[in-house]
From Swiss-Prot:
Its main location: cytoplasm. Keywords: ATP-binding, Cytoplasm, Kinase, Nucleotide-binding, Transferase. ATP binds at A28, P29, S30, G31, A32, G33, K34, S35. Disulfide bonds: none annotated. GO terms for molecular function: ATP binding; guanylate kinase activity. This is Guanylate kinase. Belongs to the guanylate kinase family. The lineage of its organism: Bacteria, Pseudomonadati, Pseudomonadota, Betaproteobacteria, Burkholderiales. Residues 21-199 form the Guanylate kinase-like domain. Its EC number is 2.7.4.8. It is found in: Cytoplasm. It catalyses: GMP + ATP = GDP + ADP.
Length: 227
């Protein structure tokens, strides 16, 4: 797609309330393999941009500010929240997380797909504002497998693992709110399913209309209920 075509599509799609880029929300309980799958998907599909969240939690080993998260203080986070800078925000395990509204809208308007690694609370907030956002819930093959993965990654103390397992049940209960569910039993199969979801989303009527609006208008095809 040329830049001129993308720009033309954007003009029509913004008027119709649809962006050229898609918004994916990946949700999972801690230890389900969400980050590993997302990183693999991003490495294979350069058309997807990862949204980097703001957080007040401490960096883990190997994490870099501006690459994995925008690490900030509670005071700064609250100031940004008061200024309505976040598309969504939530408190998870005692830490605050928030997603930049401006950055996401800029990416989607320019035709880039955006992926959010997000919790179910944040996904609910995003869905209220972007009805075409696609929710993908990653499930473990069993609770026993989830516990084993949390122990093997060696990032949390035993009491934290216990807390995460207790929270997993309530988090998994929200899987029904997602458009798609991927069971991460084997990495390769789960990744292939994620790729299929992305491909199918890009072929939805609204996505195709937003990216090829001039062609659709020429052919007399319009968005349902478009003004």
């Amino acid at each position: 797609m040329t830049d001129s075509n993308r720009g033309g599509a954007a003009a029509h799609s913004l008027h119709a309330g649809v962006y050229p880029g898609n918004l994916f929300m990946v949700v999972a309980p801690s230890g389900a393999g969400k980050s590993t799958l997302v990183n693999a998907l991003l490495s294979k599909d350069p058309e997807i941009c990862l949204s980097i969240s703001y957080t007040t939690r401490k960096p883990r080993s190997g994490e870099q500010d501006g690459q994995h998260y925008h690490f900030t203080t509670v005071e700064d986070f609250r100031a940004r929240h008061a200024s309505h800078e976040f598309l969504e925000s939530a408190e998870v395990h005692g830490n605050y997380y928030g997603t930049s509204r401006v950055w996401i809208e800029e990416q989607m308007k320019s035709g880039h797909d955006v992926l959010l690694e997000i919790d179910w609370q944040g996904a609910q907030q995003v869905k209220k504002q972007f009805r075409n956002a696609v929710g993908i819930f990653i499930l473990p093959p069993s609770l026993a497998a989830l516990e084993e993965r949390l122990k093997k990654r060696g990032q949390d103390e035993p009491n934290v693992i216990t807390r995460r397992l207790l929270a997993a049940g309530s988090e998994i209960a929200h899987a029904a709110e997602a458009e798609y569910v991927v069971i991460n039993e084997t990495f390769e199969h789960a990744l292939a399913e994620l790729e299929c979801i992305v491909a199918a989303t890009r072929l939805r009527f609204t996505s195709q209309y937003a990216r090829h609006a001039e062609l659709f208008v020429e052919l007399g095809i319009h968005l349902p209920h478009a003004e």
